[in-house]
Amino acid sequence: GPDGTGYRESALYGAGDKLVTCQIGDVTLGLTICYDMRFAEQYMALRRMGAEVIFVPSNFTLQTGKDHWEVMLRSRAIESQCWIAAAASWGGYDERGATRFVYGHSLVADPWGHVVAKASDGQGWATARIDPAVTARVRRDMPVLEHRDARRLSL
């Protein structure tokens, strides 16, 4: 981070080789983890796979959490027009002999990017009712997926 502290998750963990969705009733869920939120295209791919809600269990450091956590999750919600349910560890724990402190602040964001539930510092939880009508309205009123696909952008 900008304060000189660092943590490189990729030194300990490898990437998966496929995107995952599952069904609960009539709702398609997209599954990601912590570092995945830095890849907007992954969230768009989950949307194309039918995701309406994307889960993001995470373990963000204090610095990256403070600077990136909420803004990135809200951005992924807006871009994908999916609900984002981000559960985050909080506090300190031992990892390979060193104490690591993590940010917490679990949250739920709607497809418009509004944070509709948020945990504060400390232990706690955030809950929200996922409303499919909100998803349908946002996607109807601003059909970004169809517009994006129609443009066939290549950089």
What are these model-derived regions, one by one?
Residues 1-49, 62-71, 75, 141-144:
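Active-site catalytic loop in hydrolytic enzyme cores
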Residues 52:
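Conserved acidic residues
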Residues 58-59, 87-90:
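Short secondary-structure boundary segments
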Residues 75-76, 105:
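Residues within well-formed alpha-helices
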Residues 89-155:
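C-terminal beta-strand edge segments of enzyme domains
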